[in-house]
Amino acid sequence: MKVGTLLRLGLSDIAGRAAGLAALYAGRADDPQVVLRPSYDEVVDQARSLEAAGFDAVFTIESSHDVFLPLALAASVSGLEVMTNVAIALPRSPLHLAHAAYDLQLISEGRFALGIGSQVRPVIERAFSAPWSHPVERMREIVLATKAILACWQGGGPLEFSGRFYRHTFMNPGFSPGPNPYGIPPVLIGALGPRMTTMTAEVADGLLVHPFSSERFVRERVLPAVDAGLGAAGRDRASFSLVSNVIVATGRTDAEMAVAEAGVRALLAFYGSTPTYRPLMELEGCLDLHLELNRLAKDGRFADMATRIDDGVLETFAVRARPGEVAKAIAARYGDVADRVNLYLPYPAGTDLFAAAATGFAAG
């Protein structure tokens, strides 16, 4: 099973970043470089170290830094596959996505995958100041339009894509980079709900399963929706990639495990409070917990939220294991359905811990 992990730029755990920003803005700290530690030199070092540790891919998420730039550095100094997981698509034009995908495919010599997602309405409207409507239909057109643009560049001929939301019918030599010597990169979608997942299986090259998930959710909700989409499009499973993003709590010592579990509990509490993920919480019998977390979030009681994530909830939505057992635990859940897994460790962790976690995958 292929295994990738997050390419970090600066302080990546939510709790630590929130505390660091609060200290900076309150005047209790005066050096963002020390508090948040953004460094592109770190990206280069990580890429080399993670490849040596046994990972075959790294991914970025669209959060506090650009989602594409770190991958250009990682690809240029390693043989790792690189992917966005995910780039937020709705605020962007398909032409923007196509250019970024083309260039990263070129820089990586054919090792890039474009992962895109819709995000949720408040983020699109209030953070990106972009319109939100018909997310499933828009994402379908974004995939088809991006593929049409890349195909136009690859094979020549006119660009002819006309949809309800996007229209691309003009491409002159000044805008076209020409054929990519490494071919057209795959386009994957991060999806959660049944309509988005079914659409993904109809038109995209693969599905990025949301990290806030569970084995039951994947088997009872995700896979049937994938099968429905593949069937509607007349596609077979071999033409489609399923990537499981898995939240992992791991550590070689009890102290490391305590740090890991604290970070995972904070992340699960954040996800669990969000109305978007209510169907998942309901499926796992956690509706009351979801409602409580949502109330705490609205009251600004963020420090209290993680205390509501007990061991049972943690082990439902994340994998908790010592490094040498991580691969075995993930394989038991998703080994028969996932083409790749991406490990998500939402807490401070050195490359040596990542290497220890990757060992089991290399052995398998």
Language-model region placement:
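N-terminal beta1-alpha1-beta2 module of alpha/beta enzyme domains
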Residues: 1-83, 185
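Hydrophobic faces of well-ordered beta-strands that scaffold small-molecule active sites
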Residues: 3-7, 32-34, 57-60, 82-85, ...
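Internal, glycine-rich beta/alpha segment that forms the wall or movable "lid"
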Residues: 13-18, 27-31, 100-101, 106-112, ...
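Conserved, mostly hydrophobic/aromatic
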Residues: 54, 74, 104, 146, ...
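Alpha-helix-loop-beta-strand connector modules within alpha/beta enzyme cores
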Residues: 70-87, 91, 142, 358-364
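Catalytic cores of alpha/beta
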Residues: 94-103, 251-262
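Active-site pocket-lining/capping segments in soluble small-molecule metabolic enzymes
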Residues: 256-313
